[in-house]
């Protein structure tokens, strides 16, 4: 069986191992191997869909990336226990120190995997930031504006996407 072969999805402990392997491959920039692991895992949740989307984005398959991110956002809002990031509950008062907030706002989109333990608000932010990037490449400029507004216009990389649109 080769890469992206016709292996059926794997359930149980092996599914968890495939997810973990996919995360490791993302960290190494091995996008094809990571994508294959996530496809073969039987996970149908927001972290898996986001991680697949990140692999698609990095290989310039923007249409599929965008589709997977829409599904990840929908799964994130699903009922607890079915396709969402259980992680730490959302805490609107939770704020990192100022230095971290500045760094985050000024940084490019992180190319990191989404883990099941990620707090819901942080997961949604990662999903939306990547979705804005994919929408920009698909020339869906109104969606980029909408996402930037949803995120409070606080990310410099989104401002940079909006500059050529608004000219």
Predicted regions and their residues:
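Flexible helix-coil transition and linker loops at the boundaries of alpha-helical arrays
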Residues: 6-8, 38, 77-92, 97-121
């Amino acid at each position: 069986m080769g890469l992206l072969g016709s292996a059926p999805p794997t359930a149980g402990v092996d599914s968890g191992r495939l997810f973990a392997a996919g995360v490791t491959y993302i960290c190494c920039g091995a996008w094809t191997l990571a994508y294959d692991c996530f496809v073969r895992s039987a996970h149908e949740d927001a972290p898996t869909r986001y991680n697949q989307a990140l692999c698609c984005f990095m290989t310039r398959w923007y249409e599929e990336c965008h589709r997977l991110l829409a599904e990840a956002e929908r799964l994130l809002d699903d009922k607890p226990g079915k396709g969402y990031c259980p992680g730490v509950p959302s805490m609107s008062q939770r704020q990192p120190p100022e230095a971290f907030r500045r760094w985050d706002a000024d940084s490019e989109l992180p190319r990191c995997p989404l883990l099941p333990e990620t707090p819901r608000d942080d997961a949604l932010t990662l999903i939306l930031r990547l979705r804005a990037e994919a929408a920009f490449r698909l020339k869906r400029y109104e969606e980029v504006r909408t996402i930037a507004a949803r995120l409070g216009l606080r990310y410099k990389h989104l401002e940079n996407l909006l500059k050529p649109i608004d000219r």
